[in-house]
Amino acid sequence: MLQPKRTKFRKMHKGRNRGLAQGTDVSFGTFGLKAVGRGRLTARQIEAARRAMTRAVKRQGKIWIRVFPDKPITEKPLEVRMGKGKGNVEYWVALIQPGKVLYEMDGVPEEVAREAFKLAAAKLPIKTTFVTKTVM
């Protein structure tokens, strides 16, 4: 599972997920899976989509993960009264804005890449689209 090795602070404010995305172009591979919607991906969702893609391409080609879960999400235990401080870190998420390239792939035919990204998109809670590298 993806998570930071060490952080400056253990817990983080909730914050807001506004603004425009960084990393909107396919830069490493030939094909990419781009986010259309806004939301957050947990480390488990990122890993589940990666496994689905890897199985679909039968371990040929190369896959790049362009998102990293660096925001800790805390939860309080069940049946605990409010107050008494912030809860414990339960999982890590990556905040996603529209236009962000989530995954990239190279070394496979386009039909195989499309099918792999379709399987991966089914594991993710946000809308995505298939993109190819634009050659200038």
UniProtKB/Swiss-Prot annotation:
UniProt keyword annotations, A-Z: Ribonucleoprotein, Ribosomal protein, RNA-binding, rRNA-binding, tRNA-binding
Keyword check for DNA damage: no
GO CC annotation: cytosolic large ribosomal subunit
PROSITE patterns xrefs: RIBOSOMAL_L16_1 (PS00586), RIBOSOMAL_L16_2 (PS00701)
GO molecular function, one term: rRNA binding
InterPro entries linked to this entry: Ribosomal_uL16, Ribosomal_uL16_bact-type, Ribosomal_uL16_CS, Ribosomal_uL16_dom, Ribosomal_uL16_sf
GO biological process, one term: translation
Pfam families xref list: Ribosomal_L16
Coiled-coil region(s): none
Family named by the database record: Belongs to the universal ribosomal protein uL16 family.
PANTHER family: 50S/60S RIBOSOMAL PROTEIN L16 (PTHR12220), LARGE RIBOSOMAL SUBUNIT PROTEIN UL16M (PTHR12220:SF13)
Summary of the function given for this chain in its UniProt record: Binds 23S rRNA and is also seen to make contacts with the A and possibly P site tRNAs.
Complex formation: Part of the 50S ribosomal subunit.
Protein name from the UniProt record: Large ribosomal subunit protein uL16
